[in-house]
C-alpha cells in the first residue's frame, strides 16, 4: 500500500521532525542545506530526512536545487508565505471575535453604561 502524498502544508508541519527541518532551513538564511547536513543536525537518519524533505516539498514548503552531485534544500518562499497569510487571517478573525466578546462582557456593557 502506497502512502497518499501530503499536499496540505499544515499536515506536513504536524510532524516535529519536519518542523525541525523547516526551522533549520529558516535559520540558514536562505543558503540551504544538503540532506547530510540536515541529518547531522537531527536525531534521525539520512533516509528519514529524505522522506521528510519529500513530504515538505510535496506540500510546497521546501524546494530543492541540484548543485553538482548534491541536492540543496531551501524553504520555498511562496509556500511559507501562504501559511503565514492564512495564520494572519485566522488570527485577525479570532482577535476580532475576542474583542467583540470582551466588549460585550465588560462591566460597562453589563451595567448598560
Predicted regions, residues:
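Residues in the helix-turn-helix
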Residues: 17, 48, 55
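Amphipathic alpha-helical dimerization/coiled-coil segments
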Residues: 1-5, 23-27, 81-113
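Beta-hairpin "wing" of winged helix-turn-helix
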Residues: 57-67, 74
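Alpha-helical residues within the helix-turn-helix
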Residues: 40, 51, 57-58
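N-terminal helix-turn-helix DNA-binding core of bacterial DNA-binding proteins
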Residues: 2-45, 69-81
